[in-house]
Amino acid sequence: MRTIFLLTLLTLAALCLSDLTDAKPSGPESDKAFMSKQEGNKVVNRLRRYLGASVPSPDPLEPTREQCELNPACDELSDQYGLKTAYKRIYGITI
């Protein structure tokens, strides 16, 4: 068992150290896989859209909040218990 293991290990070492695995293909096809530094920089440094200051999205509860502010009872309850609970107690509708 030990000899099989050593033989396998030596075979793998021979394959790793051989010059056949390190040989690079020579020809016009081998250069197509790589690009110059300038071409690479053009790809990496292209303009980045959508990275500017984003516009905050409108609050979906804003109309409800404005309607609740017009009613003094709802406004007082919203200060104590929160907008959703106050709106539900006054108007009976779940937001």
Curated annotation (Swiss-Prot):
SMART domains xrefs: GLA
List of residues binding Ca(2+) 3: E69, D75
Binding positions (Ca(2+) 2): E66, E69
Molecular function GO labels: calcium ion binding; hormone activity; structural constituent of bone
Disruption phenotype: Mice lacking Bglap and Bglap2 show increased bone formation, characterized by higher bone mass and bones of improved functional quality. Mice lacking Bglap and Bglap2 also display reduced male fertility due to decreased testosterone production in the testes. Mice lacking Bglap and Bglap2 are passive and show greater anxiety-like behaviors due to impaired synthesis of neurotransmitters.
GO term, biological process aspect, one: brain development
A GO CC term attached to the entry: cytoplasm
Family: Belongs to the osteocalcin/matrix Gla protein family.
The name this protein goes by in its record: Osteocalcin
Species: Mus musculus
The organism's taxonomic lineage, starting at the top: Eukaryota, Metazoa, Chordata, Craniata, Vertebrata
